[in-house]
């Protein structure tokens, strides 16, 4: 039996156990995926216990994606750029850290044939999720990113001449190719919220919302009614889990299996 888990603060509503246990079944792995709720002062002890108990892999969620980094033996390039780790792999008693949110966002783009090279994107929000999105866009040839936040502030992922900071009051005339919501506005239960109005949405061709509950946010519904290409966050959620599993199992998962997983979890939310 192999053991895996999720480290965080409040985990009772997490879909991670269901996703990974479904993957274990499909891959015929005798695995168990547990939830590890921990207070910040005990995080170091928990990380050390991963080695002692030979837990093969863990995911990390808020608020510990930055805090775990000091306990790791290796951190991948994308995780260093983003400044956060959400996947840890134990091998030869060493802990390896990765950021699979980066790959999960790439899954949305690839599955929906959204081209980013030489295009213009606007990213709404400047929190932890935005860092993974911005890093992926920069690494894959985006021409320009407008980074929109209520308060203009930089982080390690933002030191690139292709990024221009804007407040919400400054974006009404900006036109581009891809509009990406990384804020929680529109998330269940406040499903009538939207980060921007129809006039701004109509200035873009494709909309991505990394929220997965509800499946189609008001932000996406407005875009859909204007005949925009719209993509919700369930593919990012499942995509980052698939990448974590590929790291732990040291293999690439079959495309038929992964597409089946998207279908299963698309029906989790209305």
Swiss-Prot record:
The active site is at 65 (proton acceptor). Belongs to the shikimate dehydrogenase family. Homodimer. Shikimate binds at residues 14-16, 61, 86, 101, 212. GO terms for molecular function: NADP binding; shikimate 3-dehydrogenase (NADP+) activity. Its EC number is 1.1.1.25. One of its GO terms (biological process) is chorismate biosynthetic process. It comes from Clostridium beijerinckii (strain ATCC 51743 / NCIMB 8052) (Clostridium acetobutylicum). Pathway: Metabolic intermediate biosynthesis; chorismate biosynthesis; chorismate from D-erythrose 4-phosphate and phosphoenolpyruvate: step 4/7. CDD domains: NAD_bind_Shikimate_DH. It catalyses: shikimate + NADP(+) = 3-dehydroshikimate + NADPH + H(+). Keywords: Amino-acid biosynthesis, Aromatic amino acid biosynthesis, NADP, Oxidoreductase. The gene is aroE. One of its GO terms (cellular component) is cytosol. Involved in the biosynthesis of the chorismate, which leads to the biosynthesis of aromatic amino acids. Catalyzes the reversible NADPH linked reduction of 3-dehydroshikimate (DHSA) to yield shikimate (SA). Disulfide bonds: none annotated. This is Shikimate dehydrogenase (NADP(+)). NADP(+) binds at residues 77, 125-129, 210, 233. It comes from the Bacteria.
């Amino acid at each position: 039996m192999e053991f895996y888990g999720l480290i965080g603060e409040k985990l009772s509503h997490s879909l991670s156990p269901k996703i990974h246990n479904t993957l274990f079944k499909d891959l015929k792995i005798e695995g168990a995926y547990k939830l590890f709720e921990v207070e910040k002062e005990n995080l170091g002890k928990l990380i050390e216990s991963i080695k002692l108990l030979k837990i093969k892999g863990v995911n990390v969620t808020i608020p510990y994606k930055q805090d775990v980094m000091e306990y790791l033996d290796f951190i991948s390039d994308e995780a260093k750029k983003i400044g956060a780790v959400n996947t840890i792999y134990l091998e030869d008693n060493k802990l390896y850290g990765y950021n699979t949110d980066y790959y999960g966002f790439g899954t949305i783009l690839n599955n929906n044939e959204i081209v980013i090279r030489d295009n213009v994107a606007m990213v709404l929000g400047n929190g932890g999720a935005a860092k993974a999105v911005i890093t992926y866009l920069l690494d894959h040839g985006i021409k320009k990113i407008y980074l929109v936040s209520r308060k203009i502030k930089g982080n390690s992922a933002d030191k690139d001449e292709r990024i221009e900071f804007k407040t919400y009051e400054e974006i009404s005339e900006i036109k581009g190719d891809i509009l990406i919501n990384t804020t929680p506005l529109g998330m269940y239960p406040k499903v009538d919220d939207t980060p921007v109005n129809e006039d701004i949405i109509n200035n873009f061709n494709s909309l991505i919302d990394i929220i997965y509950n509800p499946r189609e946010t008001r932000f996406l519904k407005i875009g859909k009614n204007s005949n925009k290409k719209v993509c919700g966050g369930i593919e990012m959620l499942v995509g980052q889990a698939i990448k974590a599993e590929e790291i732990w199992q040291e293999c690439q998962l079959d495309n038929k299996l992964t597409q089946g997983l998207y279908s299963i979890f698309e029906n989790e939310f209305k």
